């Protein structure tokens, strides 16, 4: 199954300095509907919370525009048209390991699983950084990540610039995923 890594990073940065981070933090150019049209059925959403406890999308230090609940509602509508459940991987994007972020993430995961669980299958519930399991979703999903930051065959600059590895390896890796690894979710940058 095709999935997109850091699915919301196509969105515009929330802060002006986010524009400087794009070469290092952007992992998708296409919006969620375009990702769906490319065949993606799994979405990797990275969540953090503001001081008021409102969730937002982030990748590293870059916050991106987009309403978390609006995106989940849009995905719910897409599942009704597709007549199939989508998979959503949720990650707490908080490498600083703050306890208040962890508590908010647990509540968020519980709420969205109850509200959207009929339409989407949620999995993972980990915190980026130490990859500790924060929320134990019912569904367990094996994944492969064909992304430069985690790839053994990535060149040094491909580990910090997602587009470079995707440009060089996506075609071959997608063929491998289709031929050999089709029983797992395969996450890609720049589908």
Task: Show the residue positions of the predicted features.
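Structural recognition of alpha->loop->beta junctions
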Residues: 107-129
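Catalytic cores of phosphodiester-bond-cleaving enzymes
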Residues: 67-115
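Long, acidic (Asp/Glu-rich), low-complexity accessory segments flanking structured domains
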Residues: 1-38, 42, 51-81, 85-87, ...
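A motif-centric signal for short, conserved binding hotspots located
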Residues: 46
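Active-site-proximal loop/turn and secondary-structure-junction residues that shape catalytic pockets
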Residues: 49, 94, 127
């Amino acid at each position: 199954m095709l999935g997109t890594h850091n699915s919301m990073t196509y969105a515009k940065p929330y802060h002006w300095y986010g524009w400087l981070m794009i070469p290092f933090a952007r992992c998708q150019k296409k919006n969620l509907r375009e990702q769906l049209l490319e065949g993606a059925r799994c979405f990797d959403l990275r969540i953090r919370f503001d001081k008021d406890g409102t969730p937002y999308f982030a990748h590293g230090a870059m916050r991106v525009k987009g309403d978390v609940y609006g995106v989940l509602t849009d995905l719910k509508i897409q599942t009704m048209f597709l007549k199939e459940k989508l998979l959503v991987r949720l990650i707490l994007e908080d490498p600083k390991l703050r306890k208040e972020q962890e508590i908010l993430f647990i509540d968020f995961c519980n709420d969205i699983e109850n509200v959207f669980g009929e339409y989407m299958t949620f999995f993972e519930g980990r915190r980026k950084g130490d990859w500790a399991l924060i929320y134990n979703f019912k569904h367990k999903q094996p994944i492969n990540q064909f992304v430069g930051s985690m790839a053994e065959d990535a060149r040094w600059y491909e580990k910090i610039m997602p587009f470079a590895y995707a440009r060089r390896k996506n075609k071959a890796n997608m063929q491998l995923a289709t031929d050999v690894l089709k029983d797992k979710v395969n996450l890609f940058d720049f589908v």
